[in-house]
């Protein structure tokens, strides 16, 4: 879809120089001399490399049309992840590398967002919030609760995260996956 460079927003995916680029940030600049331009910070979806591009305000850019579908995680076999569409039960496979470091969060029946461009899968994402059980953590020492302090914990998936002092072993917590950090304790 063609549109003006002035309409670029962070989060959009552009077709540029034969590749797909995710717009990370933009800055509108109006110099004292010459025409206004847009400085865009972009990330190549295929390689992950950052790229800076300058567009004239009236330049035409092409926004990529992406298809997003939600699938349910079934199982992983080697480097292949098997997913199922929840309404038509169609099964697909994706490469484990598409999930990057977030593959550690995979759980049975988890909803995975799959993004495709021209019928080719380009990325997959786990949910932003995942519930996990605390497998191991230090016990609380009385008197250490005067200030908000955190202690290390090992979760059921083997991941380490800092949790508040009141969290005990076997507690279920919600982890914020983009930051790999503690979000809240699950209320039962």
Curated annotation (Swiss-Prot):
InterPro entries given in the database record: Elong-fact-P_C, NA-bd_OB-fold, Rib_uL2_dom2, Transl_elong_fac_P/YeiP, Transl_elong_KOW-like, Transl_elong_P/YeiP_cen, Transl_elongation_fac_P, Translation_prot_SH3-like_sf
Keyword hit for Protein biosynthesis: yes
Gene Ontology BP term (one): peptide biosynthetic process
GO molecular function, one term: translation elongation factor activity
Superkingdom, natural source: Bacteria
Entry-linked SMART domains: EFP, Elong-fact-P_C
Keywords (A to Z) from UniProt: Cytoplasm, Elongation factor, Protein biosynthesis
Principal cellular location given in the protein's record: cytoplasm
Protein biosynthesis is among the record's keywords: yes
Compartment(s) where it occurs, according to its Swiss-Prot or TrEMBL record: Cytoplasm
Pathway stated in the Swiss-Prot or TrEMBL entry: Protein biosynthesis; polypeptide chain elongation
Cellular compartments per GO CC: cytoplasm
Family per similarity comment: Belongs to the elongation factor P family.
Record's function text: Involved in peptide bond synthesis. Stimulates efficient translation and peptide-bond synthesis on native or reconstituted 70S ribosomes in vitro. Probably functions indirectly by altering the affinity of the ribosome for aminoacyl-tRNA, thus increasing their reactivity as acceptors for peptidyl transferase.
Protein name: Elongation factor P
Lineage: Bacteria, Pseudomonadati, Pseudomonadota, Alphaproteobacteria, Rickettsiales
Protein's gene: efp
């Amino acid at each position: 879809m063609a549109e003006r460079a002035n309409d670029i927003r962070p989060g959009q995916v552009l077709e540029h120089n034969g590749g797909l680029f995710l717009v990370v940030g933009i800055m509108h600049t109006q110099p004292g001399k010459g025409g206004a331009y847009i400085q865009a910070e972009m990330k190549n979806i295929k390689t992950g490399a950052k790229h800076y591009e300058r567009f004239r305000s009236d330049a035409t850019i092409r926004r990529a049309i992406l298809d997003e579908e939600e699938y349910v995680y079934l199982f992983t076999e080697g480097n292949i992840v098997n997913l199922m569409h929840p309404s038509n039960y169609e099964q697909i496979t994706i490469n484990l590398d598409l999930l990057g470091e977030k593959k550690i969060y995979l759980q049975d029946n988890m909803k995975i967002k799959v993004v495709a461009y021209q019928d080719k899968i380009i990325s997959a994402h786990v949910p932003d919030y995942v519930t996990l059980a605390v497998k191991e953590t230090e016990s609380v020492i009385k008197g250490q609760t005067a200030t908000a302090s955190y202690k290390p914990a090992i979760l059921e998936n083997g991941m380490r995260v800092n949790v508040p002092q009141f969290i005990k072993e076997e507690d279920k917590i919600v982890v914020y996956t983009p930051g790999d950090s503690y979000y809240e304790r699950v209320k039962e």
